[in-house]
Amino acid sequence: MSPVTACEAKISCNVDACSDCVHVLQSVAELMAIRAGMEPVRANRLALAVDELFANIMRHGYAGGLGRVEMEATLDLNADGRRKLVFTFRDYAPCIENMDRLDTRPRGETIRPGGLGLCLIHAVMDEVHHEALEDGNRWRLAVYLHEREGA
């Protein structure tokens, strides 16, 4: 991972883990993607990945109960000159252990309902990191910008 040398833009928000708040996070994701110069289709995919992670936190982390989620979106410039859009999520749901053992590969031709969220997130993002904390979880999703984006 290249060290970050500058933060070009940053948005932070705290939301309840409820379906009413998903639109807030989608809007933040799309706004940051537009500020980064992403093409609309790619920005929409990125917002969908953010939506999917939030849905997973609500459904699996908080099991539909009350909770909160902190999200920070940054547009960073690495020391190597590459720009990337980073989304960091922090929840206070029970810790998820062994995330590295979950199968995030595409499922082939047989598609079953459910279980595709992490596959989608990994397909859209260049980096997906999970950290189990004492009192919750931290997720870091990053996507590198193409040279033509934001030029």
Give the location of each predicted region.
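Glycine-rich nucleotide-binding loop
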Residues: 95, 134-141, 145-147
